[in-house]
């Protein structure tokens, strides 16, 4: 290895790396700010403009886009014709390319960044050189991440060059990196448009490998959507406990999505992504009491999410139950000390717990493809009473509460509520009446004076009849069935109120 080209925006570790290369007798070529930095560190360096005989121009937009640079990178050393051309054109081979790109991601994450600022941080020459070096990996080593400096130096020191297997792995990293870079740019430029493009490319960054996937025989990992981390598990801080599992993250996400529906102090308990206890109250301690009382059996081994700081009083109660995860915007110091009694309990802090994520698309993988839709951010359309009896103010509050919960319950879903507390939840049934019967059958509370929410319309009046026998007084459903009038008449005959929400909330 004789020659390296270095041009980096991330200067981490570059000085000791370059100094070692010089010690190994490798000539350094560099550009602009990187060359200045290396010279200040008393490292010998040749400017790219000296190599090409052509100055940097257009305020630095054109630095390395030159045949002398790309010929030196792309020449296939195994072909005599390529090497003869280099000799005729007096082009020197470049054996190592060290580049990281303009910080486009960091730029667009700044508050109030302008389009002009973002555009100026779109790298052109960098990706071109990276791709050229990666294409010619049989002869050229390419580095785009400072984490690879040490391993590459070790190989050069030991063998005078890198192994082809190493160059191949580094080349793969380059194409992943440049693909992600271009996807970020395309996403940013189209961020104000909700469109379904003819070709879709998405980019995520790995947060962590997981012990396994949904089941022990499946491998798994967790990735974050770049630029959409605020208010999501990707930005949560784990304060204690075992490593998060695939199912922990999936269930915690379900709890978090439901919690975002509420502004008042609320606790959400989730099991297998379905809510099993939800309650609002004047404070988090009381909300937990109500959420736990809703279904103390199902909450065992569940996920708890709260939208206010958890104090010692609430923490003491949480410790009485076996829980997998607790997530909240914060904890008092006393609460954190108490949680240490259960070292395996995963305690997550998410200060922006009520912030709405910036991502616009909801995606579901299917065999051979991907389903994409807008996020379900609405709750109701025009709330309309369709029965002779009007619901009371208190009943309307409970109806809306129940509709928020059923929106996040697997279809067919039924939720029964009284006083801002779930009493019965029937999720994921293939028949709506079965969902109601399941909810009532597993309920430990009297249902007199409660309200019922259904995620979709009643195809028959049977849910009204069964609900009335259980003591339910008011119902909220989207409406839209050809048999709506049968359900309305059944309510009128029983003195019940029914409102149409105008918006369906299937969840699969």
Swiss-Prot record:
UniProt keyword annotation of Hydrolase present: yes
Pfam families per UniProt: AICARFT_IMPCHas, MGS
GO biological process, one term: 'de novo' IMP biosynthetic process
This protein's pathway: Purine metabolism; IMP biosynthesis via de novo pathway; 5-formamido-1-(5-phospho-D-ribosyl)imidazole-4-carboxamide from 5-amino-1-(5-phospho-D-ribosyl)imidazole-4-carboxamide (10-formyl THF route): step 1/1; Purine metabolism; IMP biosynthesis via de novo pathway; IMP from 5-formamido-1-(5-phospho-D-ribosyl)imidazole-4-carboxamide: step 1/1
Membrane spanning stretches: none
Domain MGS-like: 1-144
Protein name: Bifunctional purine biosynthesis protein PurH
PANTHER family xref list: BIFUNCTIONAL PURINE BIOSYNTHESIS PROTEIN ATIC, BIFUNCTIONAL PURINE BIOSYNTHESIS PROTEIN PURH
Family: Belongs to the PurH family.
Domain observations: The IMP cyclohydrolase activity resides in the N-terminal region.
GO terms for MF: IMP cyclohydrolase activity; phosphoribosylaminoimidazolecarboxamide formyltransferase activity
GO cellular component labels: cytosol
Catalytic reaction(s) noted: (6R)-10-formyltetrahydrofolate + 5-amino-1-(5-phospho-beta-D-ribosyl)imidazole-4-carboxamide = 5-formamido-1-(5-phospho-D-ribosyl)imidazole-4-carboxamide + (6S)-5,6,7,8-tetrahydrofolate; IMP + H2O = 5-formamido-1-(5-phospho-D-ribosyl)imidazole-4-carboxamide
Keyword annotations of the record: Hydrolase, Multifunctional enzyme, Purine biosynthesis, Transferase
EC number(s) on file: 2.1.2.3, 3.5.4.10
């Amino acid at each position: 290895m004789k020659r390296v080209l270095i041009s980096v925006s991330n200067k981490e570790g570059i000085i000791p790396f370059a100094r070692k290369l010089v010690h190994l007798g490798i000539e350094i070529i560099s550009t602009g700010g990187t060359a200045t930095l290396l010279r200040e560190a008393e490292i010998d360096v040749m400017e790219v403009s000296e190599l090409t005989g052509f100055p940097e121009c257009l305020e630095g937009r054109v630095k390395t886009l030159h045949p002398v640079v790309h010929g030196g990178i792309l020449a296939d050393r195994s072909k005599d014709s390529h090497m003869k051309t280099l000799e005729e054109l007096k082009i020197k081979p470049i054996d190592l390319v060290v580049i990281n790109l303009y910080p486009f991601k960091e730029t667009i994450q700044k508050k109030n960044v302008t389009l002009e600022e973002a555009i100026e941080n779109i790298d052109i020459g960098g990706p071109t050189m990276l791709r050229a070096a990666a294409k010619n990996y049989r002869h050229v080593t390419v580095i785009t991440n400072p984490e690879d400096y040490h391993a590459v130096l070790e190989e050069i020191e030991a063998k005078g060059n890198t192994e082809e297997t190493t160059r191949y792995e580094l080349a793969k990293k380059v194409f992943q990196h440049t693909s992600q870079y271009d996807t970020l740019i395309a996403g940013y430029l189209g961020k104000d448009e909700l469109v379904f493009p003819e070709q879709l490319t998405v980019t995520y960054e790995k947060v962590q490998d997981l012990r396994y996937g949904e089941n022990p025989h499946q491998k798994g990992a967790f990735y974050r959507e770049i630029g959409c981390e605020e208010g999501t598990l990707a930005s949560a801080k784990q304060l204690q406990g075992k490593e998060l599992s695939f199912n922990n993250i999936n269930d915690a996400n379900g709890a978090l999505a439901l919690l975002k529906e509420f502004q008042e102090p609320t606790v959400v308990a989730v099991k297998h992504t379905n809510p099993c206890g939800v309650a609002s109250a004047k404070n988090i301690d009381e909300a937990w009491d109500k959420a736990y009382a809703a279904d103390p059996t199902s909450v065992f081994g569940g996920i708890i999410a709260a939208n206010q700081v958890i104090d010692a009083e609430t923490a003491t109660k949480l410790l009485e139950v076996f829980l997998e995860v607790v997530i909240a915007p914060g904890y008092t110091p006393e609460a954190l000390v108490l949680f240490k009694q259960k070292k395996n309990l995963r305690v997550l802090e998410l200060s922006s717990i009520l912030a709405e994520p910036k991502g616009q698309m909801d995606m579901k993988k299917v065999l051979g493809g991907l389903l994409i839709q807008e996020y379900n951010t609405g709750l109701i359309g025009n709330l309309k009473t369709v029965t002779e009896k009007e619901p009371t103010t208190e009943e309307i509050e409970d109806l809306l509460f129940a509709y928020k919960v059923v929106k996040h319950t697997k279809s067919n879903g039924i939720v029964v509520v009284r006083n801002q507390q779930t009493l019965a939840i029937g999720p994921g049934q293939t028949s709506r009446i079965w969902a109601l019967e399941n909810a009532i059958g597993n309920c430990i509370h009297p249902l007199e004076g409660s309200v019922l929410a259904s995620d979709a319309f009643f195809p028959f009046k049977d849910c009204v009849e069964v609900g009335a026998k259980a003591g339910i007084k008011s119902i909220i459903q989207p409406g839209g069935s050809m048999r709506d009038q049968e359900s309305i008449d059944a309510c009128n005959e029983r003195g019940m109120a029914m409102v149409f929400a105008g918006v369906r909330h299937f969840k699969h």
